[in-house]
């Protein structure tokens, strides 16, 4: 029974890494948002399973928060924002998809090696979940670095935060009060980012980070 419990936990955490790799492959905003919704859904299942095996009821609330806000509310709101702003739906990348995917594979390998070596005495389930969580975190950071569009960078940041939640729940769980504060912080940040994007669109007629950098450079001359 314990073996099956560990296998399911590893399957869900590994699936989260796989969906993070899928995010790197996307070149359209709508597809990226759909994959992020799937990312958050897998996180929900992983946290709910951790709640079951740890007998930690507060983690069910964490899973519900992830499902409601990250898998439903935020992706739907970003879809509407893209339509209202008329944002260019193709994602411009700093490098090609191929090199980005190779970099992602390298980061996953690095996360596995580092985490398994620095936590030799940890609980096996927690140890491997932390390795998966670090992989998700690094892949989210890679999404932020390799995308020029501000919306895709926001999605990368939120996927990075999913990795942090996976790490917290996989270790010993996260106190409910902390998770609620994190959820509200993310919601507030999302509202601020939405207003910020509207203002950028009104002022510069684009949300492309490269175009904003070019404008900043011209102002300095």
Where are these regions (language model features)?
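Alpha-helical transmembrane segments of multi-pass membrane proteins predominantly involved
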Residues: 1-221
């Amino acid at each position: 029974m314990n073996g099956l419990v560990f296998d399911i936990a590893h399957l869900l955490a590994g699936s989260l890494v796989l969906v993070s790799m899928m995010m790197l492959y996307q070149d359209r905003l709508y597809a990226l948002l759909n994959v992020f919704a799937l990312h958050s859904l897998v996180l929900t299942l992983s946290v709910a399973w951790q709640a079951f095996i740890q007998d930690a009821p507060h983690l069910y609330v964490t899973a519900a928060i992830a499902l409601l806000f990250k898998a439903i509310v935020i992706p739907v709101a970003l879809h509407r924002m893209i339509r209202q702003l008329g944002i260019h739906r193709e994602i411009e990348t700093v490098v090609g998809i191929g090199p980005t995917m190779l970099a992602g594979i390298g980061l996953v390998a690095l996360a596995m090696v580092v985490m398994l070596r620095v936590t030799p005495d940890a609980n096996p389930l927690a140890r491997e979940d932390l390795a998966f969580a670090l992989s998700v975190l690094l892949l989210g950071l890679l999404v932020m670095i390799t995308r020029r569009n501000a919306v895709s960078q926001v999605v990368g940041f939120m996927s990075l935060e999913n990795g942090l939640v996976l790490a917290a729940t996989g270790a010993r769980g996260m106190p409910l009060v902390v998770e609620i504060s994190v959820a509200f912080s993310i919601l507030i940040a999302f509202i601020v980012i939405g207003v910020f994007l509207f203002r950028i669109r009104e002022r510069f007629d684009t949300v492309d980070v490269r175009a904003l950098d070019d404008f900043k450079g011209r102002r300095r001359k």
